[in-house]
Amino acid sequence: MERGNRKSRIGVVVSNKMAKTVVVKVERRVADPKYGKIVKRAEKYKAHDENNACQIGDKVRIVETRPMSKDKRWRIAETLEKAEV
């Protein structure tokens, strides 16, 4: 069940060492304000992974959700691509 317009991001899992939590790195491209060159910026989000299904390197979609802990405000919506083993 979808609850209104929630933000979503696509990123890569960089850590899965915590219980039911993964760290997802989301890269975006922005233009430098002065010179206009396109540069990559990255942000890391802690996301809830109920089944501990994600592995490092998986490409996932995360969506906003209620606060689950001090840092965790996102959850895994779907796994888009599994990592090569």
UniProtKB/Swiss-Prot annotation:
UniProt KW keywords: Ribonucleoprotein, Ribosomal protein, RNA-binding, rRNA-binding
Coiled coil: none
Keyword hit for Acetylation: no
Entry keyword Coiled coil: no
A Gene Ontology cellular-component term: cytosolic small ribosomal subunit
GO BP: any one term: translation
Molecular function GO terms recorded: rRNA binding; structural constituent of ribosome
HAMAP family named in the record: Ribosomal_uS17_B (MF_01345_B)
Protein's job: One of the primary rRNA binding proteins, it binds specifically to the 5'-end of 16S ribosomal RNA.
Quaternary structure, from the entry: Part of the 30S ribosomal subunit.
Similarity remark: Belongs to the universal ribosomal protein uS17 family.
Record protein name field: Small ribosomal subunit protein uS17
Native source organism of the sequence: Anaeromyxobacter sp. (strain Fw109-5)
Gene giving rise to this polypeptide: rpsQ
